[in-house]
Curated annotation (Swiss-Prot):
Primary location recorded for the protein, binned into one broad class: nucleus
Name the UniProt record assigns to this protein: Krueppel-like factor 11
One Pfam family cited in the UniProt record for this chain: zf-C2H2
Gene: KLF11
Organism: Homo sapiens
Span of zinc fingers (C2H2-type): 394-418, 424-448, 454-476
Tissues/organs with expression: Ubiquitous. Higher expression in erythroid cells.
Residue(s) carrying Phosphoserine: S124
Length: 512
């Protein structure tokens, strides 16, 4: 093998650099129209610097020496794989060239640092000691990069629209990659038979529809960045050799990711399964039946509060729905006649025991609606705590009389019957009668005046006292009432007339 003669190396290098710059400017303008990410500017500058360094290194390859350079593959991310090249002579600027080569001589863009070890398949290519082969490979690689960069502006985004998400953690091991795409789209530039991009427009519309659906369901950005990578599912082909557009074999086999937009919607439900909300059912409420002590007929039952569930990794996405009512389970059957109250614990204070004595006169805590005082025996423990709106709280204190009243005025009037006091005197001339109650005095005054203020609404008769009018009204009601035997006869007549129209029975008159 021999080194081919290059006519005008400076002119060829200038032409290559100008082509690269023009393609980069055109791609930037295309990316600004597509509103892609601005992270690609640094990648473009690295690509230009790498090509310039490779061109200058190819011209300096006439000097023979041992140089450790980084291989021209994205597989080497930290200088793990090195290539030994023999040169003729050494130059004084070897350290600077070695530093520039170790930092810049890699195929753009540089592979990310956060990669999975399982996806690496580094194979160190062994290059011969011939100077011609080394220079030819470098120049041909630079030409391939220049053509790929210029063709990136023409092709644009072939498959899918870029998604503004975090960078893809998958390892891209192709030699030449679309730098016009977003970092999340891991597309190799070289077309392989497994990459199904013929109907990319349909996949793009489907993906946009999926993203609108996911925005409606309020998925977080972390879900989009980890589960919705645009190259899902990826088919890995290990150990394959990539072919350039001129039929040359690249000496770095790696794992090639081929994209399939058709399988995206089949893979989406499997990726979004870890965040499915789990509804925890409400625990049932148990009623503990406490044994009844004594002669009480009330069975206390307390509701146990439900146990607090510790919130772990399960976090529902959607809003919580209305909780289902908690079922209440009661243990044994309650005997007939007993009363069971389901109350919160501590709502009712324990009843205080009552003393076994006779209620004194004037006591305000007597049994409700009692016509007379009630004697509590020693067998009864307490008085039932029942609240009534009206109570006979006023009891006559005279010995042997246990009458109770609702009002104090009624009790005072009753006490006058025991004492014989008559504070109300008749003011009529020649009348010295006295009365214990004011209503009795008013009634007596009507006997002097002859006033009859109570009138019957039926027959307009007047009465001096209201009780006389009540008795008279009952008389009117009894005269209008039909006797029982007449009602029965009338009922029989109606039944007979309904059965036979020519019935000889004649209806009796309504009143005799």
């Amino acid at each position: 093998m021999h080194t081919p003669d290059f006519a005008g190396p400076d002119d060829a290098r200038a032409v290559d650099i100008m082509d690269i710059c023009e393609s980069i400017l055109e791609r930037k303008r295309h990316d600004s129209e597509r509103s892609t990410c601005s992270i690609l500017e640094q990648t473009d500058m690295e690509a230009v610097e790498a090509l310039v360094c490779m061109s200058s290194w190819g011209q300096r390859s006439q000097k023979g020496d041992l140089l450790r350079i980084r291989p021209l593959t994205p597989v080497s991310d930290s200088g793990d794989v090195t290539t030994t090249v023999h040169m003729d002579a050494a130059t004084p600027e070897l350290p600077k060239d070695f530093h520039s080569l170790s930092t810049l001589c890699i195929t753009p863009p540089q592979s990310p640092d956060l990669v999975e070890p399982s996806t690496r398949t580094p194979v160190s290519p062994q290059v011969t000691d011939s100077k011609a082969c080394t220079a030819t490979d470098v120049l041909q690689s630079s030409a391939v990069v220049a053509r790929a960069l210029s063709g990136g502006a023409e092709r644009g985004l072939l498959g899918l629209e870029p998604v503004p998400s975090s960078p893809c953690r998958a390892k891209g091991t192709s030699v030449i990659r679309h730098t016009g795409e977003s970092p999340a789209a891991c597309f190799p530039t070289i077309q392989t038979p497994d990459c199904r991009l013929s109907d990319s427009r349909e996949g793009e519309e489907q993906l946009l529809g999926h993203f609108e659906t996911l925005q409606d369901t309020h998925l977080t950005d972390s879900l989009l960045s980890t589960n919705l990578v645009s190259c899902q599912p990826c088919l890995h082909k290990s150990g394959g050799l990539l072919l350039t557009d001129k039929g040359q074999q690249a000496g770095w086999p790696g794992a090639v990711q081929t994209c399939s937009p058709k399988n995206y919607e089949n893979d989406l439900p499997r990726k979004t399964t870890p965040l499915i909300s789990v509804s925890v059912p409400a625990p049932p409420v148990l009623c503990q039946m406490i044994p009844v002590t004594g002669q009480s007929s009330m069975l206390p039952a307390f509701l146990k509060p439900p146990p607090q569930l510790s919130v772990g990794t399960v976090r529902p996405i959607l809003a919580q729905a209305a909780p289902a009512p908690q079922p209440v389970f009661v243990g044994p059957a309650v005997p007939q006649g007993a009363v069971m109250l389901v109350l919160p614990q501590g709502a009712l204070p324990p009843p205080a025991p009552c003393a076994a004595n006779v209620m004194a006169a004037g006591n305000t805590k007597l049994l409700p609606l009692a016509p007379a005082p009630v004697f509590i025996t020693s067998s009864q423990n307490c008085v039932p705590q029942v609240d009534f709106s009206r109570r006979r709280n006023y009891v006559c204190s005279f010995p042997g009389c246990r009458k109770t009243y609702f009002k104090s005025s009624h009790l005072k009037a009753h006490l006058r019957t025991h004492t014989g006091e008559k504070p109300f005197n008749c003011s009529w001339d020649g009348c010295d009668k006295k009365f214990a109650r004011s209503d009795e005095l008013s009634r007596h005054r009507r006997t002097h005046t002859g006033e009859k203020k109570f009138v019957c609404p039926v027959c307009d008769r007047r009465f001096m006292r209201s009780d006389h009018l009540t008795k008279h009204a009952r008389r009117h009601m009894t005269t209008k009432k039909i006797p029982g035997w007449q009602a029965e006869v009338g009922k029989l007549n109606r039944i007979a007339s309904a059965e036979s129209p020519g019935s000889p029975l004649v209806s009796m008159p309504a009143s005799a």
